[in-house]
Amino acid sequence: MEFLHESVALGVDLLILGLCAREYVHYKRTAKVLKAAPQYNIDGDLKSVVERQRDKKIPYAVIRGTVTPIGVPLRSSLVPSVSGVLQIVKLHEHRVTRGFAGFWTEQHKLLHESANEMPFELRNQSHGVEIVDALSAAVLDVDVVYDNYEPSNLSLFDHVFGFFSGVRQRGLQTTEEVLREGSFLTAIGELELDGDTLRMQPSNEGPLFLTTATKSTLIKRFEDAKTTTILKLVVCSTISAILVAFIAKKLYRKRKQEREEAKIRERLDTERRERRARSRPHTLSQDQLCVVCSTNPKEIILLPCGHVCLCEDCAQKISVTCPVCRGSIVSKAAAFIA
């Protein structure tokens, strides 16, 4: 308990340090695979390029093209004039909650999310690459086509109940995001030739990206994020080093104090034994000597057996059973032998 606050602070800092290190590794690896990923044009030569690869796959590649639905495009449920290939509708609750300190803070809570997706491809004139599992993309650039906030009409009872419960609803927000038909995107993932169809899908080499940014812009984003994470690592490492040094200093002082106290106790015990030796009679019979060390006189009575058989030094070391009768020792007391 002596180092509780320092230990908790160090544990939290190490946890944050671990999360930052994990982020750094992720950003570094993603930037590395992005730099190594080849970029191809969607044209008539792309199929032959993929076909020459092992298993007819390019593990991580970059393509750019126009979003084109395979079939009838989806219509926005909230804005019918908008069509696309992917639709995400979210319902958020806006509320204020009372924290431990008594302050009210605003929070957003996702109540419902639904997504619709249809087959689509990235095309360049008459050539295209089908996109598989677009919703799993690490970066998915979509357009917000609908955003509506409806404040709550709270009654007096709702206000009173919210005050005592610590949660008060402020309103509901509905948003709809659509990947529009005709959008120009950069897709990064595994490029595979399945029969006569080219497909872009999630890869084991790196995350799937469907973004309006270029490859170089994505790399710059991850490099900037990596630099920021390095600064976080430096700060967290410095704090950890300071906390470890502070705890080590306190431990050193504690151990030093304990050693000094032990030396004082040992010196006092030695002086006490010397005083006892000077004050006791020089000639003692065998019956008057401690049954353990046979040097000091009997000074302690063991209870409940009542045997007077130990000196004070040996009594400090024996606390379980009586050395004479092997009975359990409940307590000890000084014995005065005339």
Curated annotation (Swiss-Prot):
Please report the record's description of how this protein sits within the membrane: Multi-pass membrane protein
PROSITE patterns (alphabetical): ZF_RING_2
Q: Which InterPro entries match?
A: MDM2_MDM4_MUL1 (IPR051652), MUL1-like (IPR022170), Znf_RING (IPR001841), Znf_RING/FYVE/PHD (IPR013083)
Q: Which residues lie on this side of the membrane: Mitochondrial intermembrane?
A: 25-227
Listed under catalytic activity are: S-ubiquitinyl-[E2 ubiquitin-conjugating enzyme]-L-cysteine + [acceptor protein]-L-lysine = [E2 ubiquitin-conjugating enzyme]-L-cysteine + N(6)-ubiquitinyl-[acceptor protein]-L-lysine
Question: Per the record, what phenotype accompanies loss of this gene's function?
Answer: No gross morphological defects. Mitochondria are slightly elongated.
Question: What does the record say about PTM?
Answer: Auto-ubiquitinated.
The record's subunit annotation is: Interacts with Marf.
> What's the protein here called?
Mitochondrial E3 ubiquitin protein ligase 1
Q: Which organism is it from?
A: Drosophila melanogaster (Fruit fly)
Q: Which gene encodes it?
A: Mul1
